[in-house]
Design a protein with these regions (language model features):
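Glycine-rich Rossmann-fold phosphate-binding loop(s) that bind the pyrophosphate
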Residues: 9-10
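Conserved small/polar residues in nucleotide/adenosyl-binding loops
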Residues: 101-103
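N-terminal Rossmann-fold NAD(P) dinucleotide-binding loop
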Residues: 13
């Protein structure tokens, strides 16, 4: 069992949350949208509403304590890029980031 931070709960992020739940992993889910967070409460270990581009918010989550951080922000490339960069700066062990733009 791994501890996973999942940021972004759109269609792709929710699917990841469902699969990780089936595999028995501990998942902390984060999104700015309260409805999306509420929709996954039954399938994740914990969930928070917040801005993942805010370094203080990410630091408060304890990103260093997660085995894997997944950035599944698909609608805003800049937010995805900033979040990925912040996670690395804050010492995340492993960062996996979704991009709909080939980089």
């Amino acid at each position: 069992m791994k501890s996973i931070l999942l940021i972004g709960l759109g269609r792709f992020g929710r699917h990841i949350a469902e699969e990780l739940n089936k595999l028995g992993h501990e998942v902390m889910a984060v999104d700015e949208n309260e409805d999306r967070v509420n929709a996954v409460l039954s399938i994740v270990t914990n969930a928070q509403i917040g801005d993942s581009t805010n370094a203080e918010f990410l630091e408060a989550l304890g990103v260093r304590n997660f085995d894997v951080c997944i950035v599944a922000i698909s609608g805003n490339f800049q937010s995805s890029l900033e979040t990925t960069s912040l996670l690395k700066e804050l010492g995340a062990k492993m960062v996996v980031s979704l991009s709909l733009i080939h980089i």
